[in-house]
Swiss-Prot record:
Organism: Mycosarcoma maydis (Corn smut fungus)
Subunit structure: Component of the eukaryotic translation initiation factor 3 (eIF-3) complex.
Coiled coil segments of this chain: 644-745
Molecular-function annotations in GO: identical protein binding; RNA binding; translation initiation factor activity; translation initiation factor binding
Record lineage: Eukaryota, Fungi, Dikarya, Basidiomycota, Ustilaginomycotina
Keywords: Coiled coil, Cytoplasm, Initiation factor, Protein biosynthesis, Repeat, RNA-binding, WD repeat
Protein name: Eukaryotic translation initiation factor 3 subunit B
Transmembrane regions listed in the UniProt entry: none
Recorded GO CC terms: cytoplasmic stress granule; eukaryotic 43S preinitiation complex; eukaryotic 48S preinitiation complex; eukaryotic translation initiation factor 3 complex; eukaryotic translation initiation factor 3 complex, eIF3e; eukaryotic translation initiation factor 3 complex, eIF3m; multi-eIF complex
Mapped WD repeat ranges: 189-230, 251-293, 303-344, 580-625
Location of the RRM domain: 41-129
Entry function: RNA-binding component of the eukaryotic translation initiation factor 3 (eIF-3) complex, which is involved in protein synthesis of a specialized repertoire of mRNAs and, together with other initiation factors, stimulates binding of mRNA and methionyl-tRNAi to the 40S ribosome. The eIF-3 complex specifically targets and initiates translation of a subset of mRNAs involved in cell proliferation.
Subcellular location: Cytoplasm
Amino acid sequence: MPSVDEITNGVDELDFVDDADIDFSDIEQKYSVKFDEGLDDVIVIEGVPVITESRQQKLFETIQKRFKTHANIDIAVEGMHIPYADNGESKGYIFVEMASAEDAAQAIRQMDGYAFDKKHRFSVHRFTDVEKFASLSETYEEPQEEEFKPREHLRSWLADPAGRDQLVICRGDDVEIAWHNRSSDPQVEHSRPRWTESYVQWSPLGTFLTTFHRQGIQIWGGPSCERFMRFPHPGARLVDFSPSEKYMVTWSHEPIQVPDNAPIGPQFFGPEDEGNRIAVWEVRTGHLLRSFPVPQDESGQPGQLKGFSWPFLKWSPDDKYCARLNPGQAISVYETPSMGLLEKKSIKIEGVVDFEWCPMGDKDRELAEAAKPNKKARDNMIVYWQPEVANQPARVTVMAVPSRTILRSKNLFNVSDCKLHWHPQGDYLCVKVDRHTKTKKSMFCNLEIFRVREKEFPVEVVELKDAVTAFAWEPFGTHFALISSNDPQLGTPASGITIKTQLNFYHLHPKGDFRPLKVFDNKTANTLFWSPRGRHIVVATLGSSQKFDLEWYDVDFMHEVRQGNPSADPADDVKLIGTGEHYGITDLEWDPSGRYVATSASVWRHSLENGFAIWDFKGQELQKHIQDRFKQILWRPRPRTLLGKDEQKRVRKNLREYSKQFEEEDAAEESNLASAERELYQRILEEWKAWRARSRRDLEQLRADLGREEVGQSVDHAKKLAEEATEEVQEWMEEIIEETEEVLA
């Protein structure tokens, strides 16, 4: 057995190394095991008043009450724990055990930043986040500056020399952006396979094309249609832009989940967003402004929602506000870009069912842009309605925002339902009131028309005997159209049954009231599509398995004649100018100029003759394309014109001269197309002749090699035999042209 000296090689004292002197932090971090601590339902509230133990019970009860009133969350006093310092005073924060992790997430959303009193404001976090915050480096690291990359011009498509519109077509896995040509097929500008995983959508002004992906939303724009921005909302299925394209709202059926290693930044979700389904984004920067939960059904089953309708947020026309409905309780108005509640509280309205913002007309926009000090622009307005409750009648109310001033209200009786229809220029408001008789056995309809540009908003009532199934204002005019029906099968349609309807046109009479203009009976139409410029309207039958009718009407057909004859019948102005049919039609859309109509049959609805057709404003079919797996076609919207009133008047005045120029260009284009077709035919014919001559030479060479006679001699011999075997039969036909009788003496 060796001695100690031999083992230590003569060293008097063993030189052992202490484990405490070795840094194992990198190894521990690499091989650390994450345990499921089950503390997701525990939150930490900072900013709590410093107290002694004698005041603990009172503080807990106050916090319990605040959670109930502000966040509608029940917490138990027994679930609160507060640490104390050595001097007997609390440390300014408490731990709260919530009933579930979902309640903890809601508490973070609702109570973080809550002002407990003038000196204390809550800061709420998950207990599991404390360790993560503690491990953050205290050394500031300068973020890397991204290299500036200039953007392409986002409205370049408006500079097309021919003034053509664009459209996007989805077919199978391919997405195409194409120019619309009147006399030829769409000219493809951009085409990409698998550009989107579901469908596409244009922004309201046509600046961006939206595509949907599993990881989130992407928007594209510019001459090369490059990606402009990403919005990382996993599973997003619905998108809604604000009118000026400054903001965007997305919805996903999947609750937001934030993993522990999730990136941090203004464009990413944080712990306070967990469990939410709605997200609001700033389009230009991609920053997340706020997220909202969507109330689930009491059953708690996924996908079963109550009180949810799309769009979830409705935008004011100037993008300053957005609002959402809390059914039966209130309307919550939020200011942009902070997305904070207007005046920090919702507008309490008992029983509220629906609301709509008043659009901003051209007059209002011009006034707002001029910003004259002596003329104040019209405030934003919303209209909402409340149903009948006990002895309280139903009510329609117009309110100014942000002042919350009631501008007009009207009581309604025997109301079953209301639909709110603003005129696109904000001149009128039509409330379509579905009413029942006292016995509730039959239904009829009233139109309550508010004149919102007149003092005190006078109301005109238009009474109708039948139920109204569709209503639409003329965009730039004083007409409106509606579809009514007294068919007993209305409301309970069965497969294969077509509902009989009436088409009604109304106009503003010179005496100042709305009167019937013309009625068309025995129709099957169920939808109305006004031209964006007004005057023309398409009436269609959609959703039927038997009828696919399309009808084009002009509501100002006799305008020039009537100008010289004021006594002419106004009903003569409404004229059916075109009819058509698109088998299996599922969608219809006007182009932004009001010159063309696109109808389509999508594979999303059925698989019979999928494709699209292009019509002019008079109902003449210009193109029709049957395409397998066709999904969608959308016109690219255009922004509001940059021409002022005077410039627009000058254009209208010289319209005849411009029309001649356009007609010449159209004729030249058609001539070029015809010439191109002739050249193509001639080229194909020459190619065929060359192939025939080459094949004849090859055949003659082959026959010569085989010792047979030439092709020409063989053909002549065959002709001779055919002539000998042919029997010519002649048949004489006599026809009596005239017959006369003479009597001979």
